A protein has these predicted regions:
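Non-ligating segments of multi-cofactor redox enzymes
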Residues: 1-271
Length: 271
């Protein structure tokens, strides 16, 4: 099955935040209580109830100050560390290439929040008494795209800053857009996400270096995820297996001891 991808063309984004609203509306997420912090960003970060948001960045180049806007959320890495460390398989690579999330399977361990190179997943405490928690992240509206629809944010974008299609088609379009921008004076225009971490599910056409948007120049698969995948997780399976074997052996040993201690009573015989 062809991999589907989102293209974020920052040169077309007007920071209207329609994508933020559409996301909350589709997922029936409540508004967040915020305070004025001196920035146009609202809220200031991703939250359990804010899966998509527009980031604002001031960038100075050639003596000129520019506003850079970015539609931000999960980038759906092909080499997704969050998927590799999830012990309950709540996070999976969908056949269409994006990272799906099943909230009902999440045990709130928070491993995904520790290994994401882009610091995307958020952990929400559901029950303070029991400590129950659940993770959250953008799923590309998995219920929509698996039924042939666009993500809600893409559907509502009026400028074409957000686009949705097969990955190869969007890569071709994004590269052509970068060339067009360079021909119009955007010397630092570039494509971000083609090869990073196996290829991101959210491609970006940038008009400035990635760092200007708060993006890592060279995101890397985290060492912690490698340790978990290659050492701790296999050890956990072995430990679980040994525990199960031990319980079975213990049951038989206990049962044998119980049978050995049963007093044999011969009918008709009295002490």
């Amino acid at each position: 099955m062809a991999r589907v991808t989102m293209l974020v063309d920052t040169s077309k984004c007007t920071a209207c935040r329609g994508c933020q609203v559409a996301c909350k509306q589709w997922w029936d997420l409540p508004a967040s209580k915020t305070t004025q912090t001196g920035s146009y960003e609202n809220p200031r970060d991703l939250e359990p109830n804010t899966l998509t948001r527009i980031t604002f960045h001031e960038y100075e180049s050639g003596g000129k100050l520019q506003w850079l806007f970015l539609a931000w959320g999960c980038v759906h890495c092909a080499q997704a560390a969050c998927v590799d460390v999830c012990p309950t398989y709540a996070l999976k690579q969908n056949d269409q290439g994006f990272v799906s999330f099943e909230r009902d399977l999440c045990n709130g361990c928070g491993y995904c929040t520790q290994v994401c190179p882009f610091n995307v997943p958020r952990l929400e405490t559901i029950n303070a008494l029991t400590g129950e928690a659940k993770a959250s992240k953008c799923t590309f509206c998995q219920d929509r795209v698996t039924n042939g629809l666009q993500p809600a944010c893409v559907k509502t974008c009026t400028t074409g800053a957000l686009q949705w299609s097969e990955r190869d088609a969007l890569l071709t379009k994004a590269k052509a857009r970068v060339d067009w921008l360079k021909g119009r004076g955007y010397a630092q225009a570039q494509l971000y996400g083609e090869n990073e971490l196996g290829g991101l599910g959210r491609l970006f056409v940038l008009t400035a270096p990635p760092a200007a948007y708060g993006l890592p120049e060279k995101p890397e698969y985290p060492v912690l995820a490698n340790v978990w995948q290659n050492l701790l997780q296999p050890f956990g399976y072995v430990a679980a297996g040994l525990t199960a074997v031990g319980l079975v052996v213990n049951w038989f040993a206990t049962r044998r001891a119980q049978l050995a201690n049963v007093e044999t009573i011969v009918p008709g015989k009295e002490e």
